[in-house]
Amino acid sequence: AQTAKDWAAKGRIRFDRLPADDTAAWQERMTGADLIWLESPTNPLLSIADLTTLCRAERKSGSILVVDNTFLTPLRQQPLDLGADITMQSTTKFIGGHSDLLGGSLATRDQHLVDRLRTSRTLLGASPGALEVFLTLRGARTLALRVDTAESNAKELAAHLGNHPDVSTVRYPGLGSMISFDA
């Protein structure tokens, strides 16, 4: 976000930061944007964007909707199926799983975007090395087990803390108590 803020300060782009769960504000801004970048759930507060509505919302012709899906991984959320143009993942986090990898991935079903992204990657040199690919594959092999375990543990912890007298708020979408929760 800092790079976007710097570019905006120089007048190179317009940058608006919106609460993920403010669907009306997103819909209003989407009609004039060239690039819409959503993170859902957000890190660290776990706010949930209404991706189904936003992916179907009216947008400027030719605009690109990107969803940062790092937190849920492709195992729990598939933004392309909801209508996003691009989904991105940080392979550094859940997918890698061992804190020894720096990387990311982009996915799209739009061949024109694939070609543009491939050209950018080639020109900028943003291609992973053999070790990074190995580490990503190693992490991907255990991803389902780790996500299932983390989800189970988080749900149990959130339920316990939600009933604790010294805890005023628990932000965990899986409990259904958040305003932005969608069962």
Show which residues each predicted segment covers:
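Conserved PLP-enzyme active-site core in the AAT-like
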Residues: A1-N163, R171
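Conserved PLP-binding catalytic core of the aspartate aminotransferase-like
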Residues: S168-A183
